[in-house]
């Protein structure tokens, strides 16, 4: 059943109080998130030259990751049995999915600082979902540089790879980017919720977000199987790019999982995301 959310009356209505409407809490949070993001975008666009330069700087900084891989391939023909275009596919999917999550929810990593300095309390007294406020706080549009770079590498991979395309493989491409962004977003929120308890755990969170994105840019065959099991069954980062991308490439997964497991990516993303609001609220209540 939808929760009752207090909203301020529109112009021309009784200004003596609040009007109550039946509005789902989720929709109210999305609306608040959109309004806060729009405010930060307008603020960013007030200095367009600065925005362009910082975006280009962000793009250049992230591009060095792939340049490192290219330089590596000047000395070897394959890495873990994978060619440069195949690794470019893994890289492009991981970078694009992470870039989307970082753009939309990257501000969550600052929650620990808010808990420590007490500024989180100012968000708790506002009639807006706290999660929406924290996620949209200081929205950085310059992060589209990472997404642009990831899409460029992905385009290079698709152009150079010789893949026997089927309708399922074509459908898998946008699916793994979208669901991968959802999985990374869930990791961002999980790390932020953990900071209610740990308070100074931003580096731990970064190990799973930025570190996870870097991990997925390389083939799973170069890592120990225990690590591959961990990112498959414990923190399901493997469903971002490894499992679906290996299905597209027609390669077997190191853990000998059946290929249809790649199609569980949306299920895993939904399951991972669905319990996060409850976790966030629970740990915030512990903080209070």
Regions found by a protein language model. Give the residues of each.
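A short amphipathic helical element positioned immediately N-terminal to and/or at the very start
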Residues: 29-45
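Hydrophobic alpha-helical transmembrane segments of multi-pass membrane transport proteins
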Residues: 87-152
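Transmembrane helix-boundary elements of multi-pass transport/secretion proteins
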Residues: 59-95, 254-258
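Membrane-spanning helices that line or support transport/gating and their immediate boundary helices
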Residues: 71, 103, 107-114, 119, ...
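Alpha-helical transmembrane segments and their short interhelical loops
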Residues: 142-201, 205, 254-264, 272-273, ...
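Conserved small/polar residues in nucleotide/adenosyl-binding loops
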Residues: 286-288
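Membrane-interface helix starts
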Residues: 41-57
């Amino acid at each position: 059943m939808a929760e009752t959310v207090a909203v301020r009356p529109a112009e021309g209505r009784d200004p003596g109080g609040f009007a109550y409407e039946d509005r789902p809490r989720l929709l109210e949070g999305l609306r608040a998130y959109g309004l806060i993001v729009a405010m930060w975008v307008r603020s960013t666009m007030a200095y367009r030259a600065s925005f362009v330069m910082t975006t280009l700087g962000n793009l250049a900084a992230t591009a060095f990751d792939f340049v490192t891989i290219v330089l590596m391939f000047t000395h070897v023909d394959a890495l873990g049995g994978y060619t440069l275009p195949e690794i470019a596919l893994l890289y492009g999917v991981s970078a694009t999915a992470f870039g989307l999550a970082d753009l939309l929810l990257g501000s969550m990593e600052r929650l620990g600082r808010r808990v420590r300095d007490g500024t989180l309390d100012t968000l708790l007294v506002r009639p807006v979902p706290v999660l929406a406020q924290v996620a949209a706080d200081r929205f950085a549009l310059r992060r589209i540089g990472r997404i642009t770079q990831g899409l460029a590498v992905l385009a290079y991979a698709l152009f150079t790879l010789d893949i026997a395309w089927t309708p399922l493989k074509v459908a898998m491409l946008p699916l793994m980017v979208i669901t991968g962004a959802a999985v990374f977003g869930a990791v961002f929120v999980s790390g932020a919720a953990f900071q209610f308890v740990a308070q100074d755990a931003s580096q731990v969170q970064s190990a799973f977000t930025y570190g996870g994105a870097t991990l997925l840019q390389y083939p799973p065959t170069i890592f120990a199987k225990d690590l591959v099991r961990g990112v498959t069954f414990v923190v399901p980062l493997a469903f971002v790019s490894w499992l679906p991308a290996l299905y597209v490439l027609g390669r077997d997964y190191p853990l000998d999982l059946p290929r249809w497991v790649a199609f569980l990516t949306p299920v895993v993303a939904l399951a991972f995301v669905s319990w996060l609001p409850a976790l966030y609220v629970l740990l915030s209540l512990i903080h209070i």
